[in-house]
Amino acid sequence: MSRKVLFVATVLRMHVLVFHLPYMRWFQEQGYEVHLCCANDTPDPHPQVPYCDRWVELPFSRSPFSAANREVFRRLKQLIDAEDYALIHCNTPVGGLLGRLAARAARKRGTRVVYTAHGFHFFTGAPLKNWLLYYPAERLLSRWTDLLITINGEDYARAKRFAAGRVALVSGVGVDLARFRGPVDRAAVRAGLGIGPEDAVLITVGEHSERKNHETVIAAAAPIEGAHVLFCGVGDRQAALEKQARELDMEDRVHFLGFRKDIPALLAASDVFVFPSLQEGLPVAQMEAMAAGLPCVVSDVRGNNDLIAPGEGGFLRAPRDVSGFTQDIARLLADPALRARMGERNRREMRRYSLEAVLAQMTALYRGLLDGREP
């Protein structure tokens, strides 16, 4: 086999640049040539991708039913058949679908195929249509998977019943804890946002989408006098969220900050992390908040509840339990000692999810596949 590896994912900015650079760098350090296939979701028509020797831009669609994906599959298979990769690591549902189908012939020639499930679309409480569509597909695709990586307990238990060569549970994608250790001038960060040093500040990070359920954050904060809410992210539901804030007379307390590169500073300037999402895999946003020492009030869904338990690091509520979220947020805001105690617990917990810890897990798995042995 050649000393080449291929990473496959749907998009560059929102996936590859966030999750995969440390692993691409590791392969380069081991002497491998690193190739990448994904769509360009950046504003730059010719972005520079670190630790990448060859980037093949393919217009992946997130919808598995999109006609555009037929051409993506053709070009992806053509590339895989031509390059003789030692290992192909597929990510995202569509990347995992097309990548594994395109690599079937390559597997017969010795290429190892890895798929990371960043959160199956079928899960406890998922709509029936998700189970009817995604469960059979993932079960079938596991036949052409040498290593299926899961990142939460529920997915791991389910995937062990599939036909993949091996199923592993790793601690997410890794959090760079060093980013959350530096000193931050809380007052200065707050002043830049028009928020006073003694005001209560709630923060959430993520795309403005139906899945993130940001409406619950605004509704839960509304009864808490003087509480500010920071939204870090972009998305097509922002206009609806702005309308909700106006209707609740909260437009001066809800701050839409857009896509931010200073998340560690914003977390350090906040008091409570609030995250009522409907579906997660193992949320980086929550892990980063925990690394920053924040207590968390989050929805009791897969992934979120892998990271905290009730009263341990925060509180869990049903995703749309607005009054429950309000109650838990108010309790934390009224008790600085409780916030500090839970925040310190979360800092300690994140050592298991550090970039160093996960990189060690992943490289052991990679080595095991490439050396032809069980890691």
Residue ranges and their predicted role:
Residues L6-A68, E154-K160:
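N-terminal strand-loop element at the rim of the active site
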Residues L17-P22, A200-P223, D236-E242, S323:
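A conserved mid-protein helix/loop that constitutes part of the nucleotide-sugar donor-binding site
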Residues V56-E57, R139-R186:
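Donor nucleotide-sugar binding/catalytic pocket of nucleotide-sugar-dependent glycosyltransferases
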Residues R75, R181-I195, L338:
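A short helix/loop element that forms part of the nucleotide-sugar donor recognition site in Leloir-type
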Residues F259, L278:
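Aromatic "clamp/platform" in nucleotide-sugar-dependent glycosyltransferases that forms part
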Residues P295-V298, I308:
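Short hydrophobic beta-strand element within catalytic cores of glycosyltransferases
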Residues A309-G311, F315-V322, R331-P336:
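Conserved acidic donor-binding segment of nucleotide-sugar-dependent glycosyltransferases
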Residues G324, R331, L338-R352, Q361-A364, ...:
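A short, well-ordered alpha-helix in the C-terminal region of glycosyltransferases
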